[in-house]
Design a protein with these regions (language model features):
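Long, polar/Ser/Thr-enriched low-complexity segments
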Residues: 1-114, 261-269
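Generic signature of intrinsically disordered, low-complexity segments enriched in small/polar residues
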Residues: 13, 23, 29-30, 191, ...
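Charged linear interaction tracts used for macromolecular binding and regulation
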Residues: 86-235, 241-245
Length: 269
């Protein structure tokens, strides 16, 4: 493929040319005059297209929700993971996205440079209540594996809700919790606004933050930023639970649950 050198760049088909974007570079190649596809190739391309469309829907829903540095290969990685989910369907001749198969997304990482278990030593638990809210409980943390320059560790939970029909998706996030980087922390619970009767992919995000003159800056080192799918909850996974307000208010006083916290653009290191 040749690089596009014109002022106006494009993606997709334009006449007898096809434009591509790989990373931040645009390429172009000529379109073939005739395409030969076997029956199996046509089916495989249809499955890939179905996975790509759902991947695009989920990425649009998540736009601006994750604070970790963006990865150029995240698009293809998510499409590949969704294609694996689609192929798990063994009930339909034309494979469909089945809610129970979305569990295959658990463990999918948006940050190939750092897995979640590298920056977080504990395993969180997730429960969906009757109203659809997601309660992500993070156990007590003894030591934080964060950036050496960090003064705080920021932990958030983001949920992508895939609606029936698999053509629409929404996303919601909890308020961030700031933990002192040099001190152990007590257990806390993140509450994500939820939607009933949807498939919810719960993502836990851990980033390193530096405080300067009362302002918080996210550090850019990718080795200490992680975002990973920790659970996938189906439409029937709601559980009856009771949240005691005295405990919740006591935890709010002890842990810095910062509503409307502004994390300024990442610092270069």
């Amino acid at each position: 493929m040749a690089k596009q050198t014109s002022l106006l760049k494009f993606r997709g088909k334009l006449g007898d040319l096809i434009g591509y974007k790989v990373g931040k570079t645009f390429y172009v190649r000529s379109a073939p005059e005739l395409v030969h596809q076997t029956y199996r190739t046509q089916i495989a391309s249809g499955y890939f297209g179905k996975a790509s469309r759902l991947g695009a829907v989920m990425r649009r829903a998540m736009k601006g929700m994750l604070h970790v540095p963006s990865e150029p290969g995240a698009v293809n990685s998510l499409n590949k993971a969704l294609l694996h989910v689609l192929r798990q369907d063994d009930m339909n001749r034309r494979k469909q996205f089945i809610p129970r198969n979305f569990g295959e997304l658990q463990g999918f990482s948006f940050t190939p440079h750092a897995s979640l278990d590298r920056v977080l030593e504990v395993k969180p638990t997730i429960v969906r209540d009757y109203h659809g809210r997601l309660h992500v409980t993070v156990p007590a943390i003894g030591a934080h594996a964060c950036n050496p320059r960090a003064t705080h560790v920021c932990i958030r939970a983001v949920a992508v809700h895939v609606h029936p029909g698999r053509t629409t998706a929404t996303a919601s996030a909890s308020e961030p919790v700031l933990l002192s980087a040099g001190e152990p922390s007590e257990a806390f619970t993140l509450v994500v606004p939820g939607v009933r009767d949807v498939v919810s992919c719960v993502i836990l995000e851990v980033t390193s933050v530096q405080e300067e003159h009362g302002r918080y800056y996210q550090l850019q080192n990718r080795k200490y930023s992680a975002a990973e799918v920790i659970a996938v909850l189906g439409p029937k996974s709601a559980q009856a639970m009771q949240v005691h307000s005295p405990y919740a208010s006591r935890m709010r006083q002890r842990l810095p649950l910062v509503e409307g916290l502004i994390i300024h653009p990442m610092q270069r290191e």
